[in-house]
Amino acid sequence: MAERIKTGDECAYWDALSSEYQTITRISCGDFHYGPQIPGESRLHLLPPLKAGMTALELGCGAAQNSLWLAKRGIRCTAMDISKNQLAHAKALMRREAVAIDLVHAPIERFHLFCREKRFDLIHSSHALEFVQHPDRILKRIATFLNPGGGVMVSTVHPLYNGSWITGLIEDEDGAVYDGQFLTDYFSPPDDVRDDNGCHAVSRAYPVSAWFAWFRAAGLEVTALAEPKAVRKAPYTSDDWADHGGQLDRVPSTLILVGRCMN
């Protein structure tokens, strides 16, 4: 049985990791990022049309770089994160970028308690829903907070990425040896379990078909699905991500789904 993902564990993990994460990870405010070492919105063009005055909610915002990018385009942004230390970095970036957004300290599972009277034109989350126990339930709740025709963007860990990269995995009939990704079970990928700084966290991947079904069950029409290859210059990168040795050219790290409220 899969380990239960606990909100308290995730909070402690990100509070402890925050300063190191924001130091070694370079996330630009000059592009909307979808995941590590992959193209941003300037190349992928996945977001619904944006107009000044629209409202947006970011779940699991970290330092809120995506919300700041949207705010520069006239979008009225609310950004929410479970980690107070991540939000402290967001406040510092707000001052640096001279852009105002509303920051909320709350777990994704309780976002609705802080947005009771609000509705949004866009709700987005980049690599955060893999850290919650029931992402399907979150998607259903997200749909109820959209304005008619509103959009949803979720990027998350790709199920193939939670396999193991093995050197010399395959030998062909000519004796040539190839590296590759080994995954024991695509339909139930192994968890990415993290034990750092005395804290514990779990990142969980799901099949692409599961995410597609969850969008549909929430009343969302899937308008785009992407599994981008790595690029050399990415809006979200680090030395480790950049030095992937070609693995991310062959196995996607990020799954992106964009949907629209059908009601």
Could you describe each region identified by the protein language model?
Residues L57-L59, A63-F111:
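Class I SAM-dependent methyltransferase SAM/SAH-binding core
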Residues W214-N263:
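C-terminal lobe and adjacent flexible extensions of AdoMet/dcAdoMet transferase-like proteins
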Residues M1-A52, Q65, W69, L93, G151-P189, ...:
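Conserved class I S-adenosyl-L-methionine
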Residues D136-G151:
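A short glycine-rich, Lys/Arg-flanked "PGG" loop and its adjoining helix->strand segment in the class I
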Residues T156, L160-S164, D195-A210:
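Acceptor-substrate binding/catalytic loop of class I
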Residues D191, V202-L225:
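Short alpha-helix
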Residues H124:
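A conserved beta-strand element that flanks and buttresses the S-adenosyl-L-methionine
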